[in-house]
Structure formats: C-alpha cells, structure tokens
C-alpha cells in the first residue's frame, strides 16, 4: 500500500519515505471507528508488516480544523444501536475484527507509534495502547468511558487497565475517568509527552528522513518529547483502599463513608452508571489481571456478544445506554436493575460464559 488513499477516504494509508503513515479521516465524528475503517487499518498493517521497505508505522487522527486535534473517540455507537435493534450481522463482524486489530497492534513486529493528540477514548485506546511508543500532548484526553453507555472497557481494556499501578484499573474501568496526557504517563497509559504544536513538523519530517531501522524511527520521535518533571497528585492510597474491596456494593459503601471531594465525586459518577455493568466490569478487570492479551480479548468477545443480546424480559443495558446518550439524548437511561444492591451474582455470571465452543470461537486464532 504505497499510494495514499483518496482524500475522502475515512482512513488514509500511505508510505512516506520508509514509514507507513495512517490518518484517521473522519473528523466530524471525532474519527469514530466504522467497520470499514477497521478493515482499512488492518489491511495496511498486514501489508506493511511483510514489506521490508517499511520500517515503522505512525498513526494520527484528523481534527476538524486540520491534522491532529482529535485522535479517535471510539467505536461508532450509533451504528451499534441500530445494528443491535435490527439484527445486523455486521455488529458481530465489527467486534471480531476490531479485537483482532487490537491484537495485531499489540503484537506488531515493527515499531507502531501512536500520536494521541486530543480525544483518545474507547476504540481509540484500542488502537493506541498496543503501540511501542504512545505519544500524548497537552490536549490529550484519555478514557475508557464505556460504563456510561452500559458497556464495559473492551478493545483489550481489561488487559491494559489491570496493568495500571495498584487498583487504578478498577477505578478507571468503573468510572470512565478522563486523564490528561501527563496523568496518562504517570499511570502507565502513555510513554512520552510532546507539545501539540510540534506534531505537524514531526509528521512531515518522518517522510523525509533516511532512517536505517524501525528503532531509529522510534528514537527520532523520542528526541521530540518533553520531560515530565512533575507527578500528578492523586489520592492513590484512597483509590487502592476503596477499589480493592470485594464487591461494587462494598466500594459504594466505602465511598459514601469517606469524607472529601474525591469520594463524593466518584460516588456521584458510579450512581449514574449501569449497576449491572459495574458488577460486570469489576469482575472483568480482576479476571484480566491474570490473563494474557489473547485470552482477555476472547473473554471480551464473549462479553460483548452478551451485551447486545436482548435478555428475556429485559432490554440490553448497552442498547439502552446508547439510546439515552446518543439517540434520544435524554441522558436518563432506564437501567435494569436500577440499584447496585439489586444485582445478583447469577446476573453477572452469564457474561463470562462463552457462547461458542473453543474450536469455533471467532478469535480462536489469537495467540
């Protein structure tokens, strides 16, 4: 894939010098991923993986005002909603192929450099957390906000969140808290900080520099980073104390009993989330902590299948969450159950039962 795709393409993939360059080109939707975009990114990465001329890959997002300013806001949740309601089989394809792409990035044999400027959420984290170099800026906003739509942190979220220090994985997964660039570095979700004003020059120079190896590309990018001299002040001891508790009910009770703004604000956020999915996410992150990436992605593929299946007598929490946030926009989801203490273990357990035998799992080939 040595030629640029047409400028109206949602993914522009081109080789510039000896670097494979990917631009997510859907700025009006904050580069939200469609199935076609996932397929285009995958095709480019596979072609470049086997092309000895290409030494490294760099990915960016197009902003509304031009290059950069937004990386990727996640998956196309309006598509999820419509596809779930009409039974569109492309919904199954979307998650299978997205998670396979996430695995491809994590295991890519050449340096894969993500320029994570602006919004980096959900699916945007999925195409950046596996990068060998994750560059953030002063404009970066990173999050896994899926509990806000009755979903869970997928795209490998259980895997990479559970590897954050202490119990930050549980905290970030349950709340969907948004991190700035420096915070993300402190928490192990980014590697380097760069002034956003330098990104265009970096991008242009990548295609003009006679690199000799992929490692040289990565080193060259690192030469543009800023030093992070300060650590973000976080109540890490409180996070660990509260989010290491055994259950969502215990976490909520501990927050209610803890004085201070952090506990009050965190409790207010959790009270807006799907009680069922809070229980599911806590279990997900803790299971994933002991899993490799491939197994964690297979688990998430099982989970997302259950999320979009309409439960007998109950609506899908995910369909309802998307309706409230992005379709009707009433911001009043009707969660079922409505309270944390109404969620029973038998409601959570089915999310972790695969609907496929191992030999037929859609991600069986991941290793």
Which sequence ranges carry the predicted segments?
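Gly/Pro- and small hydrophobic-enriched strand-loop and loop-to-helix capping segments
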Residues: 131-154, 188-203
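Conserved CoA-thioester-binding segment of acyl-CoA-metabolizing enzymes
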Residues: 1-60, 362-367
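Glycine-rich beta-to-alpha active-site loop
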Residues: 105-149, 172-177, 181
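An acidic, glycine-rich surface segment that forms the CoA-thioester-binding/catalytic face
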Residues: 77-116, 157, 348-357, 363-364
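C-terminal amphipathic alpha-helical interaction region
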Residues: 311-313, 317-367
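Contiguous mid-protein beta-loop-alpha structural module that forms a pocket-lining wall or clamp
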Residues: 156-159, 163-214
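A structural preference for short, pocket-lining loop segments at secondary-structure junctions
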Residues: 17, 22, 40-85, 104-115, ...
